[in-house]
Structures are given as structure tokens and as C-alpha cells.
């Protein structure tokens, strides 16, 4: 009994207002009904598509018999009012495709449209069609088209209403689907025409289909989102509010079967080389997709090209204790990636680095069960003939029940010689009255190697949320044991427990007011290492974040959050730090906590005729992590987008962070990353791109300010010590790409990339080439 009381003391350290905020989860007015009080059930006609051409003109006879729907209403940033610019949406289907036509009304001079590459409609007006083909209100297809027919597609899922979510939904635009679209600007606005082949969709095997459906419209000059089916803010689910497409039947069962051979070549040279040398030992590869049913797909690949054609955007870590996350970009893993999503990233396919062979099954089994399975041989060797492989597997199963609720399991394993790692977890989600959501995941990992037999290392991830149009409340807790290690997953920080609660209040301005919406919130977090939490010890860190945000008429936005924190010293993070006392090297121990106070402000610019962007600035007290001492931090983030013509796109990003010693204002560390991307769209499928990135990193010689400024030393693996001297690197990366991609999977890429170093920041006088290379990739999709 005394042990139980001891362990429960960790919860006594949590302030009482945490439990007050938790109770607030249930004080939301539950008298509000679901948004769709009307029955938005659209009965679709089935028509003959033999004589239709997708050309942006809705002049064929068949469009006169289509179902017509209109009456758009505002959704973001303020919901409810009738949209200033309405549109008529025409819908029908044939036995092997579904068709949409739009007649959009707008001031011709305010229509924003460019010859954008796929998925790059950020500066354009566009219509986004949401198709929940399983009608399960969990994941849906997103097909978007701008006024001249350029495309943007992906999958759409709900966001839990919290301070991090800028929209009630998330669109993963990495998956690409085959569909036809054309559009044209008219005197009254614009018209678009779309054909989505049923081969591009997954749906159940029922003889009569009912799909979830909505149409969103992005109006760039006002930055408003409008919706065809009226939507309300503050609901626990975006997808649950959508309407239905009914009476879909007599569909052809066209089995998906794609074969995608690819050919690639690469040459490179290092700093000491004059000539290029071939880097391609296995130039041929093949990918295959086969529809096991209408809603289950088998993917297989042999010697695929899993390289990326654009380098990751360099990131600067605000908190060095946390790992940086980079999204997946490789098409094989992106197809059906929604079937592997879990509350915690226990399946992170970028951990599968160079698979020589892989297979994947994703889809639905019946109406309630979904499955995702990946098996791969990850090759650490230089070629197929000299393979050194690890076997990796990932399994995700999920069972739906009671509308939007589900339960699921995750299993992954990786084996390589004497090493093995296995992860198992269960999870579930419950949504009640479309106001309350509860989500949880718990599991463990076991890691074995030649020297140690591992023990189960637990983890958990819990959240509870409630929301309505005016209020939202949240409670979360996440924990990872010190030995929890998902070999195929991603966690930003291990040996970690977090307990947090927050609340948010939103106010809405009257029509015509300068301020359309004002939101204020507060969030408080406590963090521990895992064992101290279990043992009932005091938190290592606490953090308080008041937040304020404004949406102004015309598309302007302003948000600010204040950080007030206490960070405790973690000896584990500084095991390699020593100071020299006489002839003795002594470790970093018993350091005081650091109190932080500062602010971060973001200004969102409106979408002007050809220009938009955002600027973020932060300043205040923050840890000097390099020396574990108080520091003064200054942060700048800038994103600027300029479209001087319909074909030219210029994107500029700047990330800069400086940390100074407050005593003498000397610079401890800094990171600066300007990045310029210029794209010229020659045709709908053909573009040229240049990306230039300058990554400057500086760290001063380190001193132990708590020990009279004694020098800091690092301990080498051989037991010797080295002075932490000044360190500086300035790397330049320049990439050029010719891209031809008429349809997803069929493409020609020709590229050149170079990496250079600059001895002094921004001098550009003594730059030295570190490496450069050429590559070509060609692939073609045979759709059988």
C-alpha cells in the first residue's frame, strides 16, 4: 500500500487547475445539434459518358441532366454567413467515372490563377472536392482544381481542435491520383470540368454506394474558405458534417493493375575529383499495383528508386533535446499511407532507407476493418550483388465501430544479424455528440542484441478534448520509457513524460468589422523523465503558454504566444560535458533550473495580386543549451511567395536563430538558413526548377559560466578529452531540375546538384566544391 501511495504522489504535484480544466471538458453546452440539421443527401443520376470531352466547357447535353447544387456558406475564418461569391456544382456519374462541373461566380479581376505545378495551388483560387468513399467519416479523398484546371490532390483527415491546428482538417497532398480537369476564366468568374475515374478511388463492394461529400472553395483575395454543405466551427469532426452522394450503383468492376518500370542513372564527383564517375550499379527497377478488390491494393517493388528529387528543407532546432521530423516523400510509401496512421508515429517509413525489395497491402476488409502491411528488405550494402539486408515489417489493423469510433493495433519488427526490435501497441478513439473526443494508445518495445536481452519498455499517449464554436478544452499525456525504441517509428524525445491541459476562447466580429475573429488561450505543461514520474518526484520542466490571435478583414492575420517556463537540468543530456578543475576533468552535475520568458509573434500577409507570405519574430530568455546557462534568444522566420506571371513562381524562406550570453551579449550559437526556390512552368506537365539553400551554423568556444568561466571539454570514445573550441560551417546547396510528369508515375527527371562550402559567412569569395552530381530518371505507368 505504501508503494502505491508513493507512486500516486506524482499526480499530487500536478496543480488543481489541471483537474478543473479536465472537468471543463464536460461543461460545453450539449444542446447544440449536429450541424447538418438538413438532410444533405444528394441523389445522383447515372448518365452515358460516350460523347463528353473534358475541355472546361459544360456545353454537352449530359450536363443538363446532372444534379445541380448551390448555396455556398462561409466556413473559415468565420462560419455561418452566406458566401459573397456563390457557385453552381453539377454532379453525375457513369459506370466507370464520376464527373463534376462548376460555374463559379466572382469578380473577374479578383480571380487568382496560375499555371501551377501539381499540388502547388497555394496562391490560387480553387475548388476542393471531398469524397469519403467508405462513408466512414475518418479519411477522404481530396481533389482540387484551380480556374484553369491545374490540380492538387491528396487525402483529408480530421484535426483535433487544439492550439496547434490552424484548420479543422489536415490534407496530406503527397499521394497523387489520376484524374482529368480543365478550366477557363469567364466574364462572370470561371468554369471547371472534372472527371475522376473509379480506378483512382477505393470503395466498398456494396451493390449500391453512399459516399460522404462536400465541396470547399478557397477565395484568395479574402482568404476565406466557403463550403457547399454548411459547416460549423468547433465540431469534433469535420468529415462527420459533410453531406452524402447516394444512389451510386451499377459500377464496373475494373480491377486496378499498374506496372511501372523505371530506369535511372547518376554520376558524381567529390572535392578531390576532376571527372564524374558513375554511381549507378543497378539501373533498372519495377513497381506494381494490383487491386485485390475495389478497396484493397497490393503494391510490390523490386530495386525501386527511393531517392528524392528535392532535398529536405534544412531546419533549425529550437530545442536541441528534440529530434527533427522530416516528412515522407517517396511515392511507394505515400500510396495508402493513411492506413498506417496512429496517434504516435510508431510507423515512420523514412526509417526504411534503401529497400531492395518491398511489398505492401493497404485497404478495407468489409465495411469496418482496415489493414496496412509493409514488408521490406532494407539493403545496407552497395548493390544488389553485395547485399547486407535487414528484414523490416509493419502491421496496422483498425476496427471501426459506432460511427466514428475505432480500436486498433500496431506491430513492427526489424531484425539485422544479432539485433532485433519489436513494437506492439493498441489504440482507440471515441467521439461523443460530435463535441467530445477521447483518444489513447499504449504499448511497448523490446530490443535485443548480442549482449543484452531486452525487457518491455512501455509508452502511452492519451488525449481528451471538447469543443464548440466558442470554447475548446484539452488534456493530454504522453510518456516514453528510457529504453522505448521504435526502430521503424519516430519520437522526438525519449525518456519523457508530459502532462498538459489547455483551454481556448474564440470571439467573432460582426459582419464588416475590421476584426473578424479573436482567439485567446492558455496551455500549461509539466515534463518529467520517465522513472522520476513513476517514483513521484517533482517535474523536471514546467511551461506556460498564453496565446492570442486575430483574423482581420482582407486576409491579414496576427498571432502571439508568450512562453514562461522553467527547464530543469538533465544530467543524462550532458554526460559528455566536462570542465577542467586543475588537472581533473569533472562532469556537469547539480546545475540550477533556468527560468525562461519571451514571446513569438507571427504576421500573416494577405494574398495580394501576386504576392503573399508570413513573418515570425521571437525574442526573450531561453536556455543556452550549449553551456547550460541562461541565454537570450532571437528568432526570425520568413516565408514569401511571389508569382510575377502565370508561369513563374518564386518562393523565399529564411530561418534564423541567435543565442547570446546575457552577461556580455557575446554570441554562443547561431543558425541561418535562407532558401530560394524558382520554378518556371512551361506547360501543364513540364517545368524547370532551381533551389538554392545556404546553411550557416556557428558555435562559440564553450565555457562553464557556473564555474568562473572554466573551459568546457568533450570526452572522446577513447577516454581522452578535447576542448570545445569554436565551430563554424557554411554550406551551400544548389539544385537544378527538369521535370516532365504528364500523369502520376509517368515522368522524366533530369537534374544537377552541387554542394559547396564557404569559409566565412556570406563572403562568397573562397567557396570550395564539396561534391556535385548529375542524375536522370525515367518511368512509365502501364495501366492494364
Locate predicted features.
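N-terminal secretory signal peptides that target proteins for export/translocation
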Residues: 1-13
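Structural preference for beta-rich elements and adjacent junctions enriched in aromatics
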Residues: 32-400, 408, 418
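Outer-envelope beta-barrel architecture signal
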Residues: 96-98, 139, 190, 207-211, ...
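Surface-exposed extracellular loop regions of Gram-negative outer-membrane beta-barrel proteins
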Residues: 252-298, 391-447, 512, 517-521, ...
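Alpha-helix capping and helix-loop boundary segments enriched in small/acidic/polar residues
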Residues: 275-276, 320, 349-352, 384-388, ...
Amino acid at each position: 500500500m505504501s508503494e502505491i501511495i508513493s507512486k500516486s504522489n506524482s499526480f499530487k504535484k500536478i496543480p488543481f487547475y489541471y483537474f478543473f480544466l479536465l472537468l471543463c471538458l464536460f461543461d460545453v453546452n450539449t444542446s447544440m445539434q449536429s450541424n447538418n440539421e438538413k438532410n444533405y443527401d444528394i441523389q445522383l443520376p447515372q448518365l452515358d459518358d460516350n460523347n463528353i470531352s473534358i475541355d472546361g466547357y459544360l456545353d454537352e447535353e449530359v450536363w443538363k441532366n446532372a444534379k445541380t447544387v448551390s448555396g455556398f456558406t462561409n466556413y473559415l475564418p468565420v462560419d455561418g454567413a452566406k458566401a459573397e461569391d456563390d457557385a453552381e456544382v453539377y454532379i453525375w456519374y457513369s459506370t466507370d467515372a464520376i464527373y463534376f462541373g462548376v460555374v463559379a461566380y466572382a469578380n473577374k479581376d479578383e480571380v487568382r490563377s496560375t499555371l501551377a505545378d501539381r499540388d502547388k495551388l497555394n496562391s490560387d483560387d480553387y475548388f476542393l472536392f471531398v469524397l469519403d468513399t467508405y462513408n466512414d467519416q475518418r479519411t477522404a479523398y481530396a481533389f482540387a482544381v484551380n480556374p484553369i484546371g491545374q490540380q492538387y490532390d491528396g487525402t483529408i483527415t480530421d484535426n483535433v481542435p487544439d492550439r496547434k491546428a490552424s484548420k479543422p482538417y489536415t490534407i496530406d497532398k503527397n499521394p497523387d491520383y489520376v484524374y482529368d480537369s480543365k478550366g477557363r476564366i469567364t466574364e462572370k468568374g470561371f468554369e471547371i470540368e472534372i472527371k475522376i475515374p473509379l480506378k483512382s478511388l477505393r470503395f466498398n463492394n456494396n451493390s449500391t454506394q453512399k459516399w460522404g461529400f462536400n465541396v470547399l472553395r478557397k477565395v484568395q483575395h479574402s482568404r476565406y474558405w466557403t463550403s457547399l454543405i454548411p459547416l460549423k466551427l468547433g465540431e469534433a469532426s469535420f468529415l462527420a458534417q459533410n453531406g452524402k452522394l447516394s444512389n451510386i450503383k451499377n459500377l464496373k468492376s475494373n480491377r486496378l493493375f499498374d506496372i511501372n518500370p523505371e530506369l535511372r542513372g547518376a554520376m558524381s564527383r567529390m572535392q578531390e575529383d576532376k571527372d564524374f564517375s558513375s554511381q549507378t550499379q543497378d539501373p533498372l527497377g519495377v513497381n506494381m499495383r494490383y487491386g485485390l478488390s475495389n478497396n484493397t491494393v497490393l503494391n510490390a517493388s523490386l530495386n525501386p528508386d527511393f531517392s528524392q528529387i528535392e532535398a529536405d528543407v534544412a531546419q533549425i532546432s529550437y530545442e536541441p533535446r528534440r529530434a527533427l521530423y522530416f516528412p515522407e516523400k517517396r511515392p511507394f510509401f505515400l500510396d495508402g499511407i493513411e492506413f498506417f496512421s496512429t496517434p504516435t508515429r510508431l510507423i515512420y517509413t523514412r526509417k526504411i532507407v534503401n529497400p531492395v525489395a518491398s511489398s505492401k497491402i493497404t485497404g478495407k476488409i468489409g465495411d469496418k476493418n482496415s489493414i496496412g502491411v509493409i514488408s521490406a528488405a532494407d539493403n545496407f550494402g552497395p548493390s544488389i550483388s553485395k547485399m547486407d539486408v535487414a528484414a523490416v515489417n509493419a502491421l496496422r489493423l483498425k476496427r471501426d465501430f459506432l460511427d466514428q469510433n475505432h480500436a486498433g493495433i500496431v506491430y513492427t519488427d526489424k531484425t539485422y544479424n544479432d539485433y532485433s526490435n519489436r513494437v506492439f501497441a493498441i489504440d482507440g478513439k471515441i467521439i461523443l455528440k460530435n463535441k467530445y473526443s477521447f483518444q489513447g494508445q499504449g504499448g511497448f518495445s523490446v530490443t535485443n542484441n548480442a549482449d543484452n536481452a531486452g525487457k518491455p519498455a512501455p509508452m502511452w499517449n492519451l488525449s481528451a478534448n471538447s469543443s464548440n464554436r466558442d470554447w475548446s478544452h484539452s488534456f493530454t499525456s504522453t510518456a516514453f520509457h528510457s529504453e522505448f525504441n521504435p526502430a521503424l517509428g519516430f519520437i522526438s524525445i525519449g525518456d519523457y513524460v508530459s502532462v498538459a491541459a489547455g483551454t481556448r476562447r474564440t470571439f467573432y466580429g460582426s459582419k464588416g468589422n475590421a476584426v473578424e475573429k479573436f482567439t485567446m488561450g492558455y496551455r500549461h505543461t509539466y515534463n518529467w523523465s520517465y522513472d522520476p514520474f513513476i517514483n513521484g518526484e517533482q517535474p523536471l520542466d514546467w511551461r506556460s503558454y498564453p496565446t492570442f490571435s486575430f483574423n482581420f478583414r482582407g486576409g491579414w492575420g496576427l498571432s502571439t504566444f508568450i512562453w514562461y517556463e522553467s527547464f530543469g537540468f538533465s544530467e543524462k543530456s550532458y554526460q559528455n560535458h566536462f570542465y577542467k578543475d586543475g588537472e581533473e576533468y569533472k562532469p556537469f552535475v547539480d546545475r540550477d533550473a533556468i527560468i525562461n520568458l519571451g514571446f513569438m509573434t507571427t504576421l500573416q500577409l494577405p494574398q495580394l495580386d501576386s504576392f503573399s507570405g508570413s513573418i515570425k519574430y521571437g525574442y526573450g530568455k531561453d536556455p543556452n543549451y550549449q553551456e547550460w546557462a541562461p541565454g537570450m534568444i532571437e528568432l526570425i522566420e520568413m516565408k514569401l511567395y511571389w508569382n510575377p506571371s502565370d508561369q513563374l513562381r518564386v518562393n523565399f524562406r529564411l530561418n534564423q536563430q541567435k543565442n547570446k550570453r546575457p552577461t556580455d551579449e557575446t554570441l554562443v550559437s547561431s543558425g541561418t538558413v535562407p532558401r530560394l526556390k524558382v520554378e518556371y512552368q512551361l506547360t501543364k506537365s513540364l517545368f524547370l526548377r532551381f533551389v538554392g539553400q545556404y546553411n550557416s551554423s556557428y558555435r562559440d568556444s564553450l565555457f562553464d559560466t557556473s564555474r568562473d568561466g572554466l573551459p568546457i571539454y568533450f570526452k572522446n570514445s577513447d577516454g581522452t578529452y578535447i576542448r570545445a573550441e569554436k565551430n563554424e560551417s557554411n554550406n551551400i546547396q544548389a539544385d537544378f531540375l527538369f521535370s516532365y510528369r504528364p500523369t502520376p508515375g509517368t515522368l522524366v527527371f533530369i537534374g544537377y546538384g552541387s554542394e559547396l562550402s564557404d569559409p566565412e559567412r556570406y563572403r562568397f569569395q573562397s567557396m570550395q566544391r564539396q561534391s556535385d552530381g548529375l542524375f536522370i530518371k525515367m518511368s512509365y505507368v502501364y495501366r492494364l
